[in-house]
């Protein structure tokens, strides 16, 4: 095989709609260009600095064909490893290298992996409203579009606060009440099953908003409504409590969007404490570790439901689809409709058809970035209030 030398590495940050999006572009001596997602929307400048100041000089002159070696080198070169900044930066490069290899092979990415194990991947989307009437309207709309898996949320994460009993002059933050959230969410499940029966699979994201003992009770309360899975019922530092949940309920659990380090998921998979792995592909370092994780999960009967939120480039979402049509144990793909500006910046962004996503058949990933259009949407940053989630007494809680 002829060498393909890396000649330049770019990091483009843009905000076409609500979220800061980060793309890495790798250039080579034969003109083949690769694109990858490196989005860590809460810290975009940190990722750009990592790529521009540290990874770029490390990579220029290297052979782009040696993806495994380059991934290992990038991960250990700083000695400290497996954090969200370095992992996303490495991911952007890693995806771009796979994109280059697939383009040079003149095949879509999933064929480079070994081909398809399914025609398309089932999709779930988000129905969210502050009222049941609004939630019904959203669900009805998605059912008409062909969705048969819908994540249902009554209000933002933590629910709709009602008459919060806060302190005098409360600290700035996003307040919620755990007891109200649990009561309202269990009622939501009940009403949805009464209205729709089994017309669609219900998913729900707890988003770590409960204490572990509350999470155990919540899982027991919603079990009879047969959710497809409950997402992030516990934070990564409290996963030992999964044994308590497993021993008391059969509710399906999806976990992993905050994971960065293999030690966070290894024992959960081997001991079958979860049903679905929810890792965010760029947060774990890209395609190279995602393939390994997917195969590990298959060995232990754990299915794949990658985290695929709107704060991810359509490049990253397309990578998820390629992984999902290839990996035999892939179950479902999260999807939120792209807005017009995002589509302009990322030509080729895909949309579901009748509740399924189909992988691009173009060579490579199939989605790129228009850097000229991206420049029209500069990144803006302000401290996020929603990640300053607080209980009524002012205690900060995992967001």
Swiss-Prot record:
It comes from the Bacteria. Pfam families: MR_MLE_C, MR_MLE_N. Signal peptide: none annotated. One of its GO terms (biological process) is amino acid catabolic process. One of its GO terms (molecular function) is magnesium ion binding. Mg(2+) binds at residues 205, 231, 257. D-arabinonate binds at residues 207, 257, 278, 307, 334. This is D-galactonate dehydratase family member VIC002985. It comes from Vibrio coralliilyticus (strain ATCC BAA-450 / DSM 19607 / CCUG 48437 / LMG 20984 / YB1). The lineage of its organism: Bacteria, Pseudomonadati, Pseudomonadota, Gammaproteobacteria, Vibrionales.
């Amino acid at each position: 095989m002829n060498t393909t030398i890396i000649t330049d590495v770019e990091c483009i940050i843009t905000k076409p709609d609500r979220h800061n999006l980060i793309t890495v572009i790798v250039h080579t001596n034969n003109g083949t260009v690769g694109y990858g997602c490196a989005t860590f929307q809460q810290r975009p400048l940190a990722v750009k600095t990592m790529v521009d100041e540290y990874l770029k000089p490390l990579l220029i002159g290297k052979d782009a064909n040696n993806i495994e070696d380059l991934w290992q080198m990038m991960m250990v070169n700083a000695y400290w490893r497996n954090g969200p900044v370095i992992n996303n930066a490495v991911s952007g490069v890693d995806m771009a290298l796979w994109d280059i290899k697939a383009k040079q092979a003149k095949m879509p990415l999933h064929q480079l992996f070994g081909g398809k194990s399914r025609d398309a991947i089932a999709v779930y989307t988000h129905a969210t409203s502050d009222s049941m009437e609004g939630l019904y309207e959203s669900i009805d709309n998605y059912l008409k579009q062909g969705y048969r898996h819908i994540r249902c949320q009554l209000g933002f994460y933590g629910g709709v606060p009602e008459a919060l009993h806060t302190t005098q002059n409360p600290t700035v933050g996003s307040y919620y009440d755990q007891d109200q959230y649990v009561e309202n969410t269990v009622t939501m499940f009940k009403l949805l099953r009464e209205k729709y029966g089994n017309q669609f699979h219900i998913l729900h994201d707890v988003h770590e908003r409960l204490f572990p003992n509350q999470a155990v009770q919540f899982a027991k309360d919603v079990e009879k409504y047969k959710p497809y899975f409950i997402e992030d019922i516990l934070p990564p530092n409290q996963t030992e409590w999964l044994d308590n949940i497993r021993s008391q309920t059969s509710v399906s659990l999806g976990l992993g969007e905050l994971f960065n380090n293999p030690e966070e998921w290894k024992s959960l998979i081997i001991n079958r404490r979860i049903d679905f792995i929810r890792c965010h592909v760029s947060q774990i370092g890209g395609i190279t570790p995602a393939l390994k994780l997917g195969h590990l999960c298959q060995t232990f009967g754990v299915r794949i439901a990658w985290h695929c939120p709107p704060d991810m480039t359509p490049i990253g979402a397309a990578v998820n689809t390629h992984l999902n049509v290839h990996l035999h144990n892939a179950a479902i793909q999260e999807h939120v409709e792209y807005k017009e500006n995002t589509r302009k910046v990322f030509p080729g962004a895909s949309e579901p058809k009748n509740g399924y996503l189909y992988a691009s058949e173009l060579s490579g990933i199939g989605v790129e970035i228009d850097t000229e259009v991206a420049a029209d949407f500069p990144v803006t940053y302000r401290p996020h209030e929603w990640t300053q989630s607080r209980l009524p007494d002012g205690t900060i809680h995992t967001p």
